[in-house]
UniProtKB/Swiss-Prot annotation:
Motif (Galactose-binding): 122-124
Cell location: Secreted
Alphabetical list of SMART domains matching this protein: CLECT
Name the UniProt record assigns to this protein: Galactose-specific lectin nattectin
Maturation propeptide residues: 22-24
Tissue spec. comment: Expressed by the venom gland.
Function: Galactose specific lectin that exhibits hemagglutination activity (minimum hemagluttination concentration = 2.5 ug/well) in a calcium-independent fashion. Has remarkable pro-inflammatory activity, inducing neutrophil mobilization in mice. Plays a crucial role in the innate immune system and chronic manifestations, especially in neutrophil mobilization.
Keyword terms of this UniProt record: Calcium, Cleavage on pair of basic residues, Disulfide bond, Hemagglutinin, Inflammatory response, Lectin, Metal-binding, Secreted, Signal, Toxin
Organism phylogeny: Eukaryota, Metazoa, Chordata, Craniata, Vertebrata
GO cellular component, one term: extracellular region
Length: 159
């Protein structure tokens, strides 16, 4: 009979430790406070306005980059997140730029530029120095803009 209480205690401790390990695993794969999880990344929106390079530097200090967008689902999520946090479809810096070579767009996080959400007619060459990408231009579309313009910005980092 003495072995039954020991087994019960052992079973209880094993379950408790197992649950604790599971909680720890989940906590390490969640986003920090102020960041929102989507897919395999965390996103945070900054209302304060900065030029593109300063916004990228701010994202790097937080362990990420200006957000890259790889499909329509991510674009919809980002548009909704910005609207939810700002109360409007605010024009916002994302990580695209063609500063190295005109017309050759790159993401600042080094990921493949495999999705394009440009507004029809964008990116344009109306102003030659428009090397940085913003989202929420005339809806949920992208636009190339002057990098020195101050905008809100969206950071992203991998889990």
């Amino acid at each position: 009979m003495a072995s039954v209480p020991h087994f019960t205690v052992f079973l209880f401790l094993a379950c408790a430790l197992g649950i604790g390990a599971n909680v720890t695993r989940r906590a390490t794969s969640s986003c920090p406070k102020g960041w929102t999880h989507h897919g395999s990344r965390c996103f945070t929106f900054h209302r304060g306005s900065m030029d593109w390079a300063s916004a990228e530097a701010a994202c790097i200090r937080k362990g990420g980059n200006l957000a890259s967008i790889h499909n329509r689902r991510e674009q919809n999520f980002i548009t909704h997140l910005i609207h939810k946090l700002s109360g409007e479809n605010r024009r916002t810096w994302i990580g695209g730029n063609d500063a190295v070579k005109e017309g050759m767009w790159f993401w600042s996080d080094g990921s493949k530029f495999n999705y394009k959400g440009w507004k029809k007619g964008q990116p344009d060459k109306h102003v030659p120095a428009e090397h940085c990408a913003e989202t929420n231009f005339k809806g949920a579309f992208w636009n190339n803009a002057l990098c020195k313009v101050k905008r809100s910005f969206l950071c992203a980092k991998n889990l």
